Amino acid sequence: MPQTTDKNKTLLKSRIFLPIIFISAFFFLGWGYIGHRIINYRTILSALPEMEFFNTWADSLEAHASDADQRKSWDPDEGPKHYIDIDNYPEFIATGTINQNFDSLVAIHGYSFVMDQGILPWAILKTADSIEAAFEINDMHKAMLLAADLGHYIADSHQPLHITRNYNGQYTNQTGVHSRYESNLIGNFQSQIIYDGDSLQYIANLSDFVFNMIYENYQYVDSVLYADSVAEAYAGNHNSYTYYNKFWEIARNFTIGLFQKASYRITCVIYTEWINAGGSTNDISENKNYLPSGFNLFQNYPNPFNPSTTIQFQIPNSSFVNLKVYDVLGNEVATLVNEEKMKGEYEVEF
């Protein structure tokens, strides 16, 4: 059994429930070098036709996807831009949020503390501002290089182990999980990481957008650790095909979902900065409730939960939806949805 920390004790004391959804429809339905290339390249899936420059960017965004990682070898200021140990902030543990203003946060905790925890959200915001400035002077090459960096940072924010103090499983007796998840697992199963783009949204408040996606993605920290723990117990090791196959079996759905959201959100930020620099807003709607292009069942949040949790799902066609909750022993706990649903995005509370 893994050694327990305060955070892990909360996990062990909570019952873990697994939402399972059955669909009857007309149709049946941090990422390392490889992961960053996939995420950056697939930003084009959500691009609008009028953004012609994006057609020439896709290969370059992929090629430069890891430039930011390479800079860490010679730029001492680069490293903290790739992570935030957000659960080292007492207010995050208490409220689920932190102060978004960097100077205000420094005034509360001190500069050294804030830098030690990482500055990922502010790296995203600063890079986005720089992209807008490049668009304003029509320096498209610089905008592309900055967009590649933006993609890297946003992708890091969708790698759960980049946004926690337990980034390498060192507090849960799972040392090495970081590379096992973002590099080895993704490398072994990259051919199965398939997803579509979606309708763009203009981002009215970029700071809220960036911090909210980090808060949202934090819920998957325990999901990654759980998948690693179960896979190791199943295989008796953490370096065999059996281990990685079980790891992927558990982590596949939420991992592909994180990839899809990362690519989509990168494109939304780039489009927002292009619009802010004077581009057209045709066909882009602010905070649009888009219709999904594929079926998705997202990780419930919070997880672990007490006393309630929220489960989100998307369906691409009018379907009969049966959503049930099971405990880890396979016992049915509750039926949350059992009815016809129109195409769209839904959430239910349990």
Where in this protein do the model-derived segments appear?
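N-terminal, motif-rich segments that launch catalysis or mediate targeting to/interaction with membranes
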Residues: 29-149, 165-275
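Catalytic Zn2+-binding segment of zinc metalloproteases
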Residues: 155-169
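Short, compositionally biased serine/threonine- and acidic-rich segments at solvent-exposed termini, linkers
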Residues: 281-288
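N-terminal secretory signal peptides that target proteins for export/translocation
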Residues: 1-12
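C-terminal outer-membrane/trafficking sorting elements
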Residues: 288-350
